[in-house]
């Protein structure tokens, strides 16, 4: 059977369900696909289909995730759901499933639980920009005051982690009742709540800026010198666009960044007017010697990204089974940090009161690199030791 072509008519947004175990994330995911399928906007996926999440490898780490897709009248969504708490931690740190916004599922019968808090914190630290809330299992709560109480608790919790708790939309419903009914009508007591949630997701979570519209950045993978023409840096454009005549900055591995002008852009040995995010290109740089640009640096629009050596990060440490360390590491541990295209040695400082970090842990670390790297919050990296990956991380704050 021929593959269907992906028709890009509506803006695309990545979302996902987060929240405490057994609060109904997977049931809600199933309910969304069922209700939207009644309007021809999705294929209904049963709970079991979503729950038996296939194993994926993201940067050497095994993660179980399910991806479903659906549409509303306004947008096309890719939705990620993870069966286990550890899968969420790994997913959010590796960025295996980037989220433009999250649906936080909280059981109205139980209120916020430890993982509710942890997922909100993770969302804050890895840069999930928007959260909407679905208060689930409302059919199990008879007292409306109880629901109000849980709602207040959730708003408080969001405020604690610098999300706008008072403005956050909260929809009260029951994913299970909507699944059992399945009529899909907006006026239905249960199915209507799923529509209400989708309206909220449509309205409250903005369409993200596309990579192509962001300022130009290209990690340098290789450098050649072409006799009579000058120095060429090659790599894959990470974001933005670049054309002949553009000024770019060479950043990283030294404290001094250099500016230069692009005098040629090539792709597959053909000259190109303009390259954009996703293209593998060679960029000819005016007045730059072959030893003045190297792998591990980036070319970027001047003034948009700076080199740094000290940062705070959220890190997941691989287990022995994932090919990671067999033993814990301690304060002052000095592995390599792999950013984009190169390894840089750095020293780790553990949080106060943490003596050691075990394989399988999720931890906040402070790192000091021996040479600066072009860096911003949200940048992903791998921690390596002798060429093998022992951890995955994301920059959550820049110190200097």
UniProtKB/Swiss-Prot annotation:
Annotated region (G1) at: 19-26
Segments carrying the region annotation (G3) are: 81-84
Q: Where does GTP bind?
A: 19-26, 81-85, 136-139
Q: Where is this region: G2?
A: 60-64
Q: Where is this region: G4?
A: 136-139
Q: Which GO terms describe its molecular function?
A: GTP binding; GTPase activity; translation elongation factor activity
Location of region: G5: 174-176
Q: Which GO terms describe its cellular component?
A: cytosol
Q: Name one Pfam family in it.
A: GTP_EFTU_D3
Recorded hits in CDD domains, A to Z, give: EF_Tu (cd01884), EFTU_II (cd03697), EFTU_III (cd03707)
Q: Which UniProt keywords apply?
A: Cytoplasm, Elongation factor, GTP-binding, Hydrolase, Magnesium, Metal-binding, Nucleotide-binding, Protein biosynthesis
Name the enzyme's class: hydrolase
Q: What is its EC number?
A: 3.6.5.3
Positions annotated to bind Mg(2+): 26
Name the InterPro entries on file: EF-Tu_GTP-bd, EF-Tu_GTPase, EFTu-like_2, EFTU_2, G_TR_CS, P-loop_NTPase, Small_GTP-bd, T_Tr_GTP-bd_dom
What family classification does the UniProt entry report for this protein? Belongs to the TRAFAC class translation factor GTPase superfamily. Classic translation factor GTPase family. EF-Tu/EF-1A subfamily.
Could you identify this protein by its name? Elongation factor Tu-B
